[in-house]
Regions:
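Phosphate- and other anionic-substrate recognition elements at nucleic-acid/protein interfaces
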Residues: 1-140
Length: 140
């Protein structure tokens, strides 16, 4: 089965996404990169664009992002509500992964590509939203 990973580097106003695919012959290809607004409309456009990259229903799709402050939360909740597989990774894990690759350039686009590579190489756990009670307590 082919594996489609969407790496996401998110900030307050926008986010970059990079789609990488690992095919059955184990080759890895970049399918595309694009930026979107960090808004409800941006989320819809992003999901539509992402799912168009699937060749068939046999492909496994996973969205991978860093836990950066609270900026990732709205997108993670949106994707989860759309029954998508989401993985949220601690920022220090991504930082150490970038160091291991000896990546010198630091841009949102490069970070999205690196996050996608991280997701391609690993079996990541599904993110689950916190319960409404905990979310309310945290937001106090």
């Amino acid at each position: 089965m082919s594996k489609l990973i969407i790496g996401i580097d998110i900030s307050m106003n926008d986010f970059y996404a990079c789609i990488k695919v690992r095919t059955e012959d184990n080759s890895i290809k970049i399918k595309g990169t694009r930026s979107f607004e960090n808004t409800d409309q941006g989320f819809e456009n992003f999901l539509s664009w992402s799912l168009k990259q699937k060749k068939d229903d046999e492909w496994s799709v996973r969205f991978v992002m860093e836990a950066t402050g609270v900026y990732y939360e709205n997108l993670a909740y949106y994707l989860h509500s759309q029954n998508q597989k989401v993985s949220v990774v601690l920022a220090n894990k991504i930082k150490n992964y970038i160091k291991s690759l000896n990546v010198k350039t630091k841009t949102d686009k490069v970070d999205a590509k690196t996050i996608a590579s991280f997701g391609i190489e690993r079996e990541l756990e599904n993110w689950e939203p916190m319960s409404p009670m905990y979310k309310t307590l945290r937001d106090l």
